[in-house]
Amino acid sequence: MSEIITAKHSPRIDNNIFYWYEHDTFAIQLEINLIAKETGEPIVVKDTDQMIICFYKNNIPIHKFCYTNFNNGHKFVLDFSHEVSKKFTEGTYEYRIIYVGSNKTTIVAKNFAEVEKWVIQI
């Protein structure tokens, strides 16, 4: 009897790499808790502040998510709709998260995402 090999969960984070399959559509909620280095106190994200998540392939910008109005705390949703997902072909991407409050601060740099090819073999 033959077995069907199942796909790995998509999207997923494994060894600090964000994976998903090419053409997948999904929404993933992120929550970022910022701590002031000087005081050790939490930084309160204001409604006027901004989070920018940028994806690059070979240092070429692929897509940018921008969020304001943080009325739900420090949470925001990356919506990989059909329009967004089709920008991401198989391969490795770098992503960065920038917080813009009273200052502009890179809070995540040189993290990686891997878009995997799905192949149907008969």
PLM feature segments, named:
Residues 1-122:
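Contiguous segments within soluble domain cores/interaction surfaces
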